[in-house]
Amino acid sequence: MLVPKRVKHRKVQRGKMRGEAKGGKTVTFGEFGLQALDSHWISNRQIEAARIAMTRYMKRGGKVWIKIFPHLSYTSKGVGTRMGNGKGAPEGWVAPVKRMKVMFEVAGVPEEVAREALRLAGNKLPVRTKIVKREEVGGQSNED
């Protein structure tokens, strides 16, 4: 599973996730990508479940790029704990994903296989998703 090797701060504030992603909105490495249509925190377990769903459907063919990394810890207090007494203990790791961010990319498999693999991966995630195709530069192919 994806976890950071070291972090500067063990506990972080939640912050806000407003607006679209600033970068990573296009398919850069592969041929097809899975794009988020909502903003949400995605845990390292959800990322791993999506990766396994894709690679199993593709029968270990092709290549998968994971373009998000869970670098923030999330905390929770015990169930019967009263208010106050500080912030809870770190429970796991999350990746903040904003709207329009491409989270996964796939290459090296036929289009229908890639689309089905990305659809299965999207079912494992807590956001609505869209499958996007890599656009050619300027609407033309680069075969000059």
UniProtKB/Swiss-Prot annotation:
UniProt GO cellular component terms: cytosolic large ribosomal subunit
GO MF annotation, one: structural constituent of ribosome
Q: Which InterPro entries does the record match to this protein?
A: Ribosomal_uL16 (IPR047873), Ribosomal_uL16_bact-type (IPR000114), Ribosomal_uL16_CS (IPR020798), Ribosomal_uL16_dom (IPR016180), Ribosomal_uL16_sf (IPR036920)
What Pfam family is a match, any one?
Ribosomal_L16
Is the Magnesium keyword given for this protein? no
Biased composition, Basic residues: where in the chain? 1-16
Region (Disordered) residue spans: 1-20
Q: In which domain of life is the source organism classified? A: Bacteria
Please give the biological process terms from Gene Ontology that the record holds. Answer: translation
Q: Which Gene3D superfamilies match?
A: Ribosomal protein L10e/L16
Q: Which UniProt keywords apply?
A: Ribonucleoprotein, Ribosomal protein, RNA-binding, rRNA-binding, tRNA-binding
Q: What family is it from?
A: Belongs to the universal ribosomal protein uL16 family.
Subunit structure of this chain's protein: Part of the 50S ribosomal subunit.
The role this protein plays is:
Binds 23S rRNA and is also seen to make contacts with the A and possibly P site tRNAs.
Q: What is this protein called?
A: Large ribosomal subunit protein uL16
Source species of the chain = Limosilactobacillus fermentum (strain NBRC 3956 / LMG 18251)
